[in-house]
Amino acid sequence: PRALNSFRDAFSIWHENHPLAEPVRITLPVPPGTDLSRVHVYRHVGGWSRQDTERSASGLTIETRRLGLFQAFEDRHAPYLNVTSPPPNYHAQTKRPILTARVADAHSGVNGFGATANGEWLLVAYDPEHGELRWDRDEDLNSGTQNIEFWASDHAGNVSRKSVTVVVP
């Protein structure tokens, strides 16, 4: 992926359509002392796709049933996050206003998400098909000014936070 840092050269293992009866484990060695906290192995199939990656002192290991082109990339980019409802400094008409945000991560993928109102957790659902976080509106918000904060993290540990102020009746 263009926006990711290439960790080392790509490596090709056999042909990508070669059938495998059982999954194989592939380990990519790394220099001792390398910080691997944001590094994953990606497989190229029409585009780069993150593979579940085990990290150890000896290297990066994946288990796969498909061979082909692999490369390690470091993801230092936080997910895209944008509050879509309500607008800033919104004066709500109800104690359960609609609270939504758009989220996407084109690199290692969305791994975690949440929202709070003045530090109190809100029950939030994530719709990956539409890239949307939505408060379930399961209980009333407290009256007064509420700082609503959405957050999202990716598989590399990068985190985005966005907030909006809502005045609740």
State each model region's role.
Residues 18-20, 89-95:
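Short, solvent-exposed loop/linker segments at the N-terminal edge
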Residues 76-80, 86-87:
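Proline-centered linker/hinge motifs at extracellular inter-domain junctions
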Residues 44-66:
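Short, surface-exposed beta-strand/turn "edge" patches of beta-sheet domains
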Residues 61-78:
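C-terminal beta-strand-rich structural cap/linker in extracellular carbohydrate-active enzymes
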Residues 65-67, 96, 143-147:
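Extracellular Ig-like/FN3 beta-sandwich strand-entry sites
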Residues 25-31, 98-106, 151:
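Short edge beta-strand/loop segments characteristic of extracellular beta-sandwich folds
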Residues 1-45:
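Proteolytic processing hotspots in large secreted/extracellular or virion-associated proteins
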Residues 59, 106-169:
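Long, low-complexity serine/threonine/glycine- and acidic-rich segments characteristic of extracellular
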